[in-house]
Amino acid sequence: MKFDSLIIGGGVAGLSCAIRCAEAGMKTAVIAAGQSALHFSSGSIDFLSRLPNGQPVYHPMAAFNELQQQSPEHPYCKLGKRKVQEALDWYQEMIKARGIYLSSQEDEANHLRLTPMGTFRSTWLSQQTVHQFPLTNTAGELNHIALVTVDGFRDFQPKLAADNLSKLAQFKDVKITTAAVELPDFEEMQRNPCEFRSIDISRVLRDERKLHAFAKSMIQAVGKADLVVLPAVFGNGDGAATIKLLEGLTGFTICELPTMPPSLLGIRLEEAMKSHFKMLGGIILVGDEVQRGDIEDGELKRIFTRNHRDMPLIADNYLIATGSFFSRGMAAQRLSIDEPIFNLDTVAIPDRDQWYQPEFFASKAHPFLKMGVICNDQLQASANNQTIDNLFCAGALLAHYDPVFEGCGSGVAISTGFHVAEQMISKHTARQNQNNKERTIA
């Protein structure tokens, strides 16, 4: 099978690249081994929360010069400020077309999102159903917050969250209460409520009659509150509409927070991106895995997958965006770090004792998270120190940055995927123009 572009990996980086290529009319396919890390994600887009030295970032764009000084090999620095801004603007508009509205603070500063543990994480863009707490004066005008869960739901414990939230100095004058609301018609269900995950609850509450009953129970359980916080259990495609309806039924201001996996806020992004890609004519090879490829004369000629075996997949350009260790895009051996498909050149620390901090929850970053594939400024990979002209890298596979410590995972994934797509489009256009010119001469 022959394509203009083949994308290895179905996460944010891979799908961003694939969608942009498909928008340009390129024949594009995505090879996805399974569920992406979006199923474990908050559904917010982190741009840059901390600099490599640990300094918190208020305004990501304003921190670019300092980032360049501290980490010149950082993926953002390879792309440049303008390209990163262009990529994130494109992503906001693209995902908006699928009904998901991502926004930042009015001054485009970072904001805080509430976690299931009752702590805060800095991020840049959040979905319309997520309450944005400002970095300064975090509690704002809130006097009463109600943390509400579904009775028996294991993936959000509001009392634990309330205890942690009440310990924060900014919330010392804020009343924080908890409540549990029983699912409608619970006695008729055949399952124990402790077995229900967020997706199961979302299916129950799609029934409008049950949603009305749930709203009445919420009013009784909560009473009054300035902000009602619920776990994200309201559908992956229609969650925002359900929340809006629930606000109308209860009179509450309601926000969602991501649950323990599976995270519906993350799944919403994934399904929106996949449906958009398919609408553009893209192909997704689900449940398949690239096992090897043939590299000749500095080019990747073909790849072979588990399902297609001896039938190669061929493209003019390839992107590998298989993620880091969590997604098996990188493999850690006893004394080495490897990229397992093409054996690409990687950044590694020879002394294993230097891979990590002595404590897991350390104040400094774990060095192994900056290990990854070496790329040039065009994000082209290399093997045995030879650049592979038509093989690009994007996302968590890249070296020289720590998506967890720096809070920039989604931003790097989107911007590098977009940057690679723009180069693929440019090469594709040049090839078409050359072919047209040759036909004209002939």
UniProtKB/Swiss-Prot annotation:
Pathway: Polyol metabolism; glycerol degradation via glycerol kinase pathway; glycerone phosphate from sn-glycerol 3-phosphate (anaerobic route): step 1/1
Keyword ATP-binding annotated: no
Reaction catalysis annotation: a quinone + sn-glycerol 3-phosphate = dihydroxyacetone phosphate + a quinol
Example GO biological process: glycerol catabolic process
Gene Ontology molecular function terms on file: glycerol-3-phosphate dehydrogenase (quinone) activity
Family assignment from sequence similarity: Belongs to the anaerobic G-3-P dehydrogenase subunit B family.
Stated name of the protein: Anaerobic glycerol-3-phosphate dehydrogenase subunit B
